[in-house]
Structures are given as structure tokens and as C-alpha cells.
Amino acid sequence: MASNTSRSAHLAQIITENTANIETYRREQGLPPLSLGPDAPLDVKYPPNVEKCRRAVIDATLELGELATGPVELRLVPGWAIMTMFGVTQFICDFDIARQIPLAGDISYEDLSKAINVAVPVLRQVLRAGMPYHMFYESRPGHVAHTATTKVMASESLISDWTSLYTDVLFPASAGLSKALREEPTASDPSKTGFMVTKGDGESGMYMYFEKHPEEARRFAGVMEAFQKDEAYAVRHLTDSWPSDSQTGKLVDLGGSTGAVAFALAEKFPGLEIVVQDLPGALEAAHVREGKNVSFMPHDFFNEQPVKDADVYMFRWILHNWPDGHVQRILRALVPSLKPGAKVIVFDEIMPPAGTLPLSIERYQRNIDFGMLTLFNSKIRDIVEWKEIITQSDQRFNVTGVRYPENSRLSLIEIVWQP
């Protein structure tokens, strides 16, 4: 491995060259220089070649900053930063600070204090703690205004929902993980997750908890909606990679909600007859569309599958939410209904081998994986784990193919029932 000095110089060069490419593109497009100031564009989408430069800058900056910080400070400083950012962010969410401050202009600490009923000295102390992390800034003495990162919380409801979710759900779940693992060392029970031991009241899992807490359920649904809008989770990745020999016949979409995926498949493959199954509450907003061969059926996928002899049974972005034992129960519930040669298609996340991704993407994937553990006692499985859990469910399940659509976070696992 190269010395830290040569590695540092190399990283600095990556940052310089790729930042120049990004700034050149922005100038050519009439965009301002990179900034988190109040007038900065909130969400710039780059073409693939420029996005590659952006990702290179992010990864090199992360690594170079940590090399310069050193091992001791890396263990001491982030804890303070995480504590501060969490506390300030929770304060911003709980008191709806982002919406109290005008999108254009500023507000005095005195007026903000009256609006939220928090004393000026304390209000100033909390907000100033967040300012080094780009949360608001003092536009003039005694006044506070938005940065781009707080403006988006006021103007984009999905961002606001996500921010509230990680202060009210994700952080408490993480804090409860150790306690949960002392109670359930195998992390196999959805009722004994970090989230459930921290916030639960005897429910069998997080979704049952949400049934009693509709506002938290609404925020969670909003965040899932935001994920679905991300290009990396676009439905077209599934339709484009759909097996050519499964474009006609009967398809059962388990956990298909209101049928967005089913209708996309029906549009592209009119020879499919699709049955969407989900719990009754999830189907309340579902509507049959004229001319589309899609129907809806209430069903709990832990129970025996009522649709017999379908050609394909599909789980899109479902099984990662469940511990291994529960995934096996879900798959075994299909068995009495499967005909020889029937397919099960799993379209879900597959964790790449450790250390093979760029640093920022590796951290993102591991963050999601850790979140699955703290919320559901589940995981983002690698392909070996997927194959093991499938064949352990029943040896007659045969994994016949795996497809990794370009630019998709979800991959397609094709399983054939061979009794």
C-alpha cells in the first residue's frame, strides 16, 4: 500500500481535477458555483459523466479528511458531531423551525423565540450549534436565515418527513440495538429489534406499531415514496430485466400495494394476467384500471398462497424487511400452490462483497443494512446469503439466474420450482 503522503497527494489531485470538471459543467449550464448558501439550487441532476466526477470528489474528500484527522480524533470528534447534529436536528423538527423562518429574508431571535416559546439565549445556543453543520446562518446580528440545507426542509415535505423519521425512528432504533441483542442475541424476532425495545409496547413488529401511531406511519410512507422516486429504484429496471420466457401467463405480485409495479408490467407485457396481493389496509387505495389485466386480492403472504398454478410469483423490494426465518416462512407458504416449472422472482437489494464499492456508496449500503437490523432484525443480503435462504426454505427451489440492471439498486433473482 502506498504511503499516506503519496495517497494524500493522489486524493488531492482527484479532488482538484474532478471539481474543475464539475464547475466547468455548471458554468456551461448557467448554474452558479457549488454552494450551500440560501440561493443555491436545491437539487441539481448531473449527466452520467459529471455525476462520476461528483462521486469521485465525495469519495476522495471523505478519505482525505479522515487521513488528515488521524486515528485518535476519528474516534473522539465524530461522537460529538453526531450528538450535536442529532440534537439540533431533532429540535428543528420538533419545533418546526424550518417553517418558522421565511424562505427569503430572515427572522430575529426574539420573534422566533415568541413563535416557539423557547427563551432567546437557549434558542440562540441551539441554533448556533448547528450552524457549523450548514443548518441556518446569522444573516445579520440577532437574526437567523436559511441555508440551502434547511430551506429544503421547509419547502420539500418528503425531506421534512425523512428528517423527522431519522430523529424519531432511526436514531432511537440504533440506540436500542445493544439492549435488543441482549434480549435476542440471534436477531431473529421482529418484535425485539432496537426500534421495538425502545419505542414498542408489545406489538409484534414495527408495522404493527405504526398501526397505533398513524403520524409516524404517514412519515414512513412518505419516505418510502421518496425512495421509489429515486431513479435507482425506478420500476423500469424491473420491466427492462424481466425474463423473456415469463412475459405471458398468470403473475402474482405479493406485497404489491396499490399496483404501481403491476400496472407497469401490464403496460409492457399485455399477455400477463396479474393478481396483486397485500393486506386489506394496503389495498384500500387500489383501483382497477380499464384495459389493464390487473386485479387485487387481500392476502397475508405468511399464509398459504390461494392462487394455484400461477406461472410467476413475485416479491419486489419485500423480503429484505424480514429476518431469515420469516423469509423462509413466506417462501414455504407458496409451496402448496406451485406447479412444476413455476417461477419465483425476487427483485431486491443484493449487497456487494465488502470493500468493493466506492467509499461513499459502501457507507450508504452499510447504513441501509444497519437500519434493516435496528428496525426489522433483517439485512441486505449478499448473493450467497440469498441463495442459502432460498434453498434452505425448500430444496426444490432452484436459483437459475441473477441479473444486475445497470444503475439500479435492486437486482433480479430468478427461482424455478423443480419438484
Curated annotation (Swiss-Prot):
PROSITE patterns: SAM_OMT_II. S-adenosyl-L-methionine binds at residues 255-256, 278, 300-301, 316. It holds the Pfam family Methyltransf_2. The keyword Transport does not apply. Griseofulvin is a spirocyclic fungal natural product used in treatment of fungal dermatophytes. It catalyses: 2-(2,4-dihydroxy-6-oxidobenzoyl)-5-hydroxy-3-methylbenzenolate + S-adenosyl-L-methionine = griseophenone D + S-adenosyl-L-homocysteine + H(+). Disruption phenotype: Impairs the production of griseofulvin, but accumulates the intermediates norlichexanthone, griseophenone E, griseophenone F and desmethyl-dehydrogriseofulvin B. GO terms for biological process: griseofulvin biosynthetic process; methylation; terpenoid biosynthetic process. Its EC number is 2.1.1.-. The active site is at 320 (proton acceptor). Pathway: Secondary metabolite biosynthesis; terpenoid biosynthesis. One of its GO terms (molecular function) is O-methyltransferase activity. The keyword S-adenosyl-L-methionine applies. Keywords: Methyltransferase, S-adenosyl-L-methionine, Transferase. O-methyltransferase; part of the gene cluster that mediates the biosynthesis of griseofulvin, an important antifungal drug that has been in use for a long time for treating dermatophyte infections. The first step of the pathway is the formation of the heptaketide backbone by gsfA which is initiated by priming with acetyl-CoA, followed by sequential condensations of 6 malonyl-CoA units. The resulting benzophenone can undergo a spontaneous dehydration to form norlichexanthone. Belongs to the class I-like SAM-binding methyltransferase superfamily. Cation-independent O-methyltransferase family. This is O-methyltransferase gsfB. It comes from Penicillium aethiopicum. The lineage of its organism: Eukaryota, Fungi, Dikarya, Ascomycota, Pezizomycotina. The gene is gsfB.
